Amino acid sequence: MLDINRIVQNPEELLSTLQKRGVVSSDIEAKIKSVSEKQRILKLEVEELRAERNRVSKEIGIQKSQGKDITEISNSMKGVGDRIKSIEEELTKEEESLHELNLGLPNLLDPSVPEGKSEEDNVLIRQWGEIPKLSFEAKTHFDIGEKLGIFDFERGVKLSGARFYTYRGLGAKLERSLMNLMLDTHTSENGYEEMWVPVLVNDESMTATGQLPKFAEDFYRLEKDGLNLIPTAEVPLTNYYRDEIIQEKELPISVCAHTSCFRREAGSYGRDTRGLVRVHQFQKVELVKFVEPEKSGEAHEKMLQDAESILQKLKLPYRVMLLCSKDMSSASSKTYDIEVWMPGLGRFMEISSVSNFKDYQARRGKIRYKSKEGKNLLVHTLNGSGLAIGRTLAAVIENYQSEDGTFQIPDVLKPYIR
């Protein structure tokens, strides 16, 4: 959700963002200007009528005190009151129309975001670690896991359908160990407060973080209850402060949570149909920050390093990519992807997205802070995966595999395995 006054005063900024994102923008600017101008005229008219009503009310009081007949002047005021009511109703409709239009607009792009058409245009920022040179043909994590009996995809399908799975024994222990490593690192070393949050949220929450109204087909909904299964803990963590005013001295606020995440993965059929890469239910540790606007750029870089720290502890090779304009989520102003090397798949795989939303989500969710000067201002929100646990486990198996079809456990995880 954008600052409409800013858009009206500088429409080129929005048009540039829409063009770079590949959004059809032929009439968006005209609609915003038309509705905004109509609002301005209606507000002016209602202010003039209210001023007239106040003036006449004073005149009625004077004439009444003088014993004069006020019937005619009182009758004239009834029409003014009816007109004010009519304009206020029309104004409410225009405000709702503008609000709905604004909800569908993407975030303005940060100036540093490269223009591009696809992931091929993303920019490499850095690469960490050496890609392992195996003396044998690398196997995939799902082949290794199934052979060792720590994954069971067949029974996952039996229980729930395609893109579901189960862990057994060491598989379940490794998932739990990775979760604990991530939470311990982020809370003890990276400065986050751990939270526990619901995985079912209302529509207001999904709207504030940008999933609604645009991406309703991408998540699971409990229609009878009016609740939605979260696609990421970003939703409840960010909405924790929805409709609230935070004191400036409390900022920055850094929180993290481990949750199950649920995604329909609509439109992804045929891609990564095997293994832990693209599934309907998975575990993830999420990082969220609330900061003052002038500090969000620095906070973004710090959050990126926090997510990277997990891969460095696990000694997994990865690269950081700055996403181009058409490969970003519509709510993000700037996004980095962390991609881990997967020997079995023979490619890098996204394992974390770290995004700066600036005031886009805060405006939708009315998340503000009171400055030292006493002004209520919008915070900037950021979030990132720290990390997706199933994908991290897949990367561990593929990078630590042996020729005999087994794999080693990273040293940093051994204290967590009992």
Curated annotation (Swiss-Prot):
Positions of transmembrane segments: none
Catalysed reactions, as listed in the record: tRNA(Ser) + L-serine + ATP = L-seryl-tRNA(Ser) + AMP + diphosphate + H(+); tRNA(Sec) + L-serine + ATP = L-seryl-tRNA(Sec) + AMP + diphosphate + H(+)
Pathway(s) where this gene product acts: Aminoacyl-tRNA biosynthesis; selenocysteinyl-tRNA(Sec) biosynthesis; L-seryl-tRNA(Sec) from L-serine and tRNA(Sec): step 1/1
Binding residues annotated for ATP, in chain numbering: 263-265, 279, 350-353
Top-level EC class: ligase
InterPro entries: aa-tRNA-synt_IIb, aa-tRNA-synth_II, aa-tRNA-synth_II/BPL/LPL, Ser-tRNA-ligase_type_1, Ser-tRNA-synth_1_N, SerRS_1_N_sf, SerRS_core, tRNA-bd_arm
Pfam family name, one: Seryl_tRNA_N
Keywords per UniProt: Aminoacyl-tRNA synthetase, ATP-binding, Cytoplasm, Ligase, Nucleotide-binding, Protein biosynthesis
GO molecular function: ATP binding; serine-tRNA ligase activity
Record's GO cellular component terms: cytoplasm
Taxonomic superkingdom: Bacteria
Chain sites annotated for binding L-serine: 232-234, 286, 385
EC number, UniProt record: 6.1.1.11
Subcellular localization, as worded in the UniProt entry: Cytoplasm
Subunit text: Homodimer. The tRNA molecule binds across the dimer.
Domain notes: Consists of two distinct domains, a catalytic core and a N-terminal extension that is involved in tRNA binding.
NCBIfam families: serS
Stated family: Belongs to the class-II aminoacyl-tRNA synthetase family. Type-1 seryl-tRNA synthetase subfamily.
Protein's job: Catalyzes the attachment of serine to tRNA(Ser). Is also able to aminoacylate tRNA(Sec) with serine, to form the misacylated tRNA L-seryl-tRNA(Sec), which will be further converted into selenocysteinyl-tRNA(Sec).
Identification of the protein by name: Serine--tRNA ligase
Organism: Leptospira biflexa serovar Patoc (strain Patoc 1 / ATCC 23582 / Paris)
UniProt lineage: Bacteria, Pseudomonadati, Spirochaetota, Spirochaetia, Leptospirales
